[in-house]
Design a protein with these regions (language model features):
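M16 family metallopeptidases and their MPP-like homologs
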Residues: 1-41, 50-96, 112-121, 172-193, ...
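Non-catalytic, conformational "gating/processing" segments within enzyme and secreted inhibitor domains
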Residues: 77, 99-135
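Glycine-rich, charged/polar anion/phosphate-binding loops
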Residues: 101-103, 158-164, 215-221, 322
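A short, acidic, amphipathic alpha-helical segment used as a generic capping/interface helix at domain edges
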Residues: 101-104, 316-329
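Glycine-centered hinge/linker elements that transmit conformational signals in sensory
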Residues: 131-145
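C-terminal, active-site-flanking charged/polar segments
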Residues: 137-140, 199-203, 249-254
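His/Glu-based metal-binding/catalytic segments typifying zinc-dependent metallopeptidases
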Residues: 141-202
C-alpha cells in the first residue's frame, strides 16, 4: 500500500486463487512481477507451517461459536453443494496435514498454474501482453492447459426437498428456506431480484414487526450453482422450527394473493429504482472494474452480463412477474432446500 497499490488474495467460486491489485496502474505490473517471483521462490519454514496450521484450526473450531444466521449459511452451503466438506471433516483433515504434505502440494501447485489476467484501467494493450509473457516465463511450464473450474454436481429436481436439521450450542432457533428454480436463466434471476425487492419489506413488517416471530426476518434472491433462488431467513428466540416453517409458507401464499392487487405503478417504480442503480456512474475505477469480475471468472469474455440484465429488466412487466410467481408457488415448480 505504501506504493499506492493494495494487493489482496482473491479466490473465486471455482476453486482458483487469484490476486486483486487496486491503485496506481503504472505501478501494478511491477508489483505483480515481484509477487509472482516471490511466489515461485517461496520457502515454507516448519515453524511457519505449524503456526498457520494452528491459526486455521482455531478458526475452524470457532465456527460453532458464530451466531445462528452465520451457521445457517455454513450448513446451507453443504446441502446445496457449494461447500464440499463439513467443518468436522475440515478439522480432521487439517490435523492430519504434515509439513511434507504442504511442500508436496506447493510443488504440485507451482507446476500447474494456468495464468489468466484481467486488466482494467490505464493500460496499453501491449503492456498487458508483455506482462503475461513475463509472468509465464517466471512461472515456467505448466501441466494445466485450460482454465480449471470446479463445478458442483448439482441438479434441481422439481417437487423435491433437501432438509438438514442441526443442533448447536446457541440459544434460539433459525431457519434458512430456499426455493430453487429448475432452469438456469439470467432473465429469471433478474425477475426474482425484482420480486424480492417488492416482497422483502412486507416479509420484514409481517414476521418481524407485526407477528414478532423472530428478531431477524429477511428475504433475498441469489443463485444456487447458477440456478435462480429466492430465500427467507428467520432467527428467533421465542418460536420453534415447525412454526417458523409454517409462518414462511403462510407468508408466501398471502404474498401470491396480494401480488395480483399490486398496482402496476409500484412494479414500474421498483424497476426504475433498480435501473437507476445499474446506470449509476461508478464512484471510482475500482468499482467500475469490479462489475466485470464475475464475467471474467466464469469465462464470459464478452463481459455483457450487466447489459443483458438491464435489457431483461427493462422488458419485464408485472404480468411476467405474476407468471413467475404462479409458476414458482402455485404450480410448485421449484426445489426446496432448508436448514
Amino acid at each position: 500500500q505504501g506504493g499506492g497499490v493494495s494487493i489482496l488474495p482473491n479466490p473465486d467460486n471455482y476453486g482458483n486463487i487469484g490476486f486483486f491489485m487496486a491503485g496506481r496502474s503504472m505501478r501494478q505490473i511491477g508489483y505483480a512481477n515481484d509477487l509472482i517471483s516471490k511466489l515461485m521462490e517461496f520457502e515454507i519454514k516448519d515453524w511457519e507451517f505449524k503456526n498457520a496450521k494452528e491459526i486455521i484450526l482455531d478458526q475452524l473450531e470457532s465456527i460453532e461459536e458464530d451466531d445462528i444466521s452465520s451457521q445457517l449459511f455454513v450448513h446451507d452451503a453443504l446441502i446445496n453443494k457449494t461447500q464440499k466438506w463439513t467443518t468436522k471433516e475440515n478439522i480432521e483433515a487439517t490435523k492430519k496435514i504434515t509439513y511434507e504434505d504442504v511442500q508436496r502440494i506447493y510443488q504440485e501447485f507451482t507446476n500447474s498454474i494456468f495464468l489468466d489476467i484481467y486488466a482494467y484501467g490505464n493500460y496499453d494493450p501491449s503492456e498487458v501482453v508483455n506482462f503475461a509473457k513475463s509472468a509465464r516465463n517466471i512461472i515456467g511450464d505448466t501441466s494445466q492447459k485450460i482454465h480449471w473450474r470446479d463445478i458442483p454436481d448439482f441438479s434441481v429436481k422439481t417437487g423435491t426437498a433437501r432438509m438438514k436439521k442441526v443442533s448447536i450450542s446457541k440459544d434460539g432457533v433459525g431457519l434458512l428456506d430456499n426455493y430453487v428454480y429448475p432452469v438456469k436463466s439470467e432473465e429469471i434471476s433478474i425477475q426474482l431480484n425484482l420480486i424480492n425487492r417488492l416482497m422483502r419489506p412486507t416479509f420484514f413488517n409481517e414476521l418481524r414487526t407485526l407477528q414478532e416471530v423472530g428478531y431477524i426476518a429477511s428475504s433475498f434472491d441469489s443463485e444456487t450453482n447458477e440456478y435462480p433462488t429466492l430465500s427467507m431467513l428467520i432467527v428467533s428466540d421465542n418460536t420453534n422450527l415447525k412454526d417458523l416453517k409454517e409462518k414462511v409458507m403462510g407468508f408466501i401464499y398471502s404474498f401470491v394473493v396480494a401480488f395480483d392487487q399490486l398496482p402496476d405503478s409500484t412494479v414500474e417504480n421498483t424497476k426504475k429504482a433498480l435501473l437507476d442503480e445499474m446506470n449509476k456512474i461508478p464512484e471510482n475505477l475500482g468499482i467500475e472494474a469490479s462489475q466485470y469480475f464475475a464475467d471474467w471468472g466464469e469465462g464470459n469474455y464478452s463481459f455483457d452480463t450487466k447489459q443483458k440484465a438491464k435489457e431483461y429488466l427493462e422488458n419485464t412487466t408485472k404480468q411476467d412477474l405474476t407468471n413467475l410467481i404462479n409458476d414458482f408457488f402455485i404450480q410448485g415448480n421449484y426445489m426446496n432446500t432448508t436448514v
